[in-house]
A protein has these predicted regions:
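Soluble non-cytosolic domains of exported or imported proteins
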Residues: 57-65, 111, 115, 151-164
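C-terminal segment of classical bacterial N-terminal signal peptides
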Residues: 18-27
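Surface-exposed short loop/turn segments
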Residues: 76-81, 88-133, 141-152
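A structural "domain/chain start" motif
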Residues: 26-71, 79, 100, 128, ...
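A cross-taxon signal for low-complexity, glycine/charged-rich
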Residues: 1-4, 10, 15-19
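C-terminal/domain-edge helix-coil "capping" segments
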Residues: 126-129, 144-177
Length: 177
């Protein structure tokens, strides 16, 4: 009989413990949202992103690739509506650098790696909160094997670099990182 009471008490204690833990877990939650973290949507609802001209003689498609990636990021990850004029936020700038430099030089002055660097100057203007304006140049690079022809890796490298620069711009302007 004592054994049955013990099992009953043990089962009751276990059920109560599980109930308490379950109620704690269902009532407590932590939510992180990194999209448009510093935008005050009560004041700011529109954005205009100008075309970024490519001031370098290389990779003529760079301007289009960058413009599309930047627009996509801001339109998909914020609640801002794109307009052609009188925007609350304006983003403009230019592609200032597209450079290939030798890396890891070895015997006979031959570089086993080549570095592709892209730099983009950005002017971010918040017409509702001017203290959040940003005027900065963002750069990123990727290294590739010098035995590979640039033409065979260029579009993939450009996409990777552009994605990284767009991340940096987004984080420096609206994500508040």
């Amino acid at each position: 009989m004592d054994w049955n009471k013990f099992r009953l008490l043990r089962a009751t204690a276990l059920a109560m413990t599980c109930g308490v833990l379950l109620s704690i877990l269902t009532t407590c939650s932590i939510s992180y949202k990194f999209e448009g973290g510093s935008i005050n949507y009560d004041k700011t609802q529109t954005i205009h992103i100008s075309e970024f001209p490519n001031r370098t003689p290389n990779y003529p498609l760079l301007s289009q690739v960058f413009d599309l990636a930047l627009r996509k990021r801001f339109i998909e990850q914020t609640r801002l509506r794109e307009v052609s004029s009188n925007a609350d936020i304006e983003i403009e700038g230019e592609i200032t650098n597209y450079q290939l430099t030798p890396q890891a030089v070895r015997d006979g002055d031959f570089a086993s790696k080549t570095r592709l660097t892209i730099s983009i100057r950005v002017h971010y203007i918040n017409n509702k909160e001017s203290n959040k304006d940003v005027d900065q140049t963002f750069s990123a690079f990727r290294d590739f094997d010098s035995a590979q022809a640039l033409e065979s890796v260029e579009s993939d490298l450009v996409k990777q670099i552009v994605d990284e620069i767009v991340d940096m711009i987004y984080n420096a302007t609206v994500a508040n990182w």
